[in-house]
């Protein structure tokens, strides 16, 4: 049985500000099932941003598990991610899940892989999903060559990825944790 999949999730960090966004397309094989899915969530008292790529049902299971870890560890992102990864490696059900998470708080950006690995990406850019490499390339160029804020970099990079990747679209949801306490969300 085919799974729902295909997406672009991107997180960009500059200074004390981080933006995490994703497109809204869900595909089943080569058919677009939904174009306005929300793959980005705020967790733990709105202090943690999380986005998923991969099987939709699998990703929601991981969201629930990750949120439980955040609650258990008082919102400590690194510890919660490592504890989820430990569970992922030892729990038979979790090992079969086909999804990845990109998560961020005001201090760290992480990728939690389908193998149960926790990676802190270089340059403050985390990208997952079928359009992730396209978005990451665009974000890196913009981060290194402009003074754009993370929100603008994520917007432009997701647009570029959506133009290239057939499993991504131009319906974006972007959440921001800001250094001035201006946390916000954007839906385009």
Swiss-Prot record:
One of its GO terms (molecular function) is metal ion binding. GO terms for cellular component: HslUV protease complex; proteasome core complex. The keyword Metal-binding applies. Pfam families: Proteasome. Keywords: Allosteric enzyme, Cytoplasm, Hydrolase, Metal-binding, Protease, Sodium, Stress response, Threonine protease. It catalyses: ATP-dependent cleavage of peptide bonds with broad specificity. The keyword Zinc-finger does not apply. It is found in: Cytoplasm. One of its GO terms (biological process) is proteolysis involved in protein catabolic process. Na(+) binds at residues 162, 165, 168. The active site is at 7. Its EC number is 3.4.25.2. Its main location: cytoplasm. Allosterically activated by HslU binding. It is an enzyme of class 3 (hydrolase). Protease subunit of a proteasome-like degradation complex believed to be a general protein degrading machinery. A double ring-shaped homohexamer of HslV is capped on each side by a ring-shaped HslU homohexamer. The assembly of the HslU/HslV complex is dependent on binding of ATP. NCBIfam families: ATP_dep_HslV, PRK05456.1. Belongs to the peptidase T1B family. HslV subfamily. This is ATP-dependent protease subunit HslV. It comes from Thiobacillus denitrificans (strain ATCC 25259 / T1). The gene is hslV.
């Amino acid at each position: 049985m085919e799974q729902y999949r295909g997406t672009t999730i991107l997180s960009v960090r500059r200074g004390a500000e981080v933006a995490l966004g994703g497109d809204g397309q869900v595909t089943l094989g080569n058919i677009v099932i939904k174009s306005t899915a929300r793959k980005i969530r705020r967790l733990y008292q709105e202090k943690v941003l999380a986005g998923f790529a991969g099987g939709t049902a699998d990703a929601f299971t991981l969201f629930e598990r990750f949120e439980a870890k955040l609650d258990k560890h008082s919102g400590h992102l690194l510890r919660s991610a490592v504890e989820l990864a430990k569970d992922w490696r030892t729990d038979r059900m979790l090992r079969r899940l086909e999804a990845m998470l990109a998560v961020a708080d005001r201090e760290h950006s992480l990728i939690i892989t389908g193998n149960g690995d926790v990676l802190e990406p270089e340059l403050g850019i985390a990208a997952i999903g079928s359009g992730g490499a396209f978005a990451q390339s665009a974000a890196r160029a913009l981060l290194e060559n402009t003074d754009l804020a993370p929100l603008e970099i994520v917007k432009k990079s997701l647009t570029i990825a959506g133009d290239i990747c057939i499993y991504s679209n131009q319906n974006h949801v972007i959440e921001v944790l800001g250094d001035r306490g201006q946390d916000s969300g954007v839906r385009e």
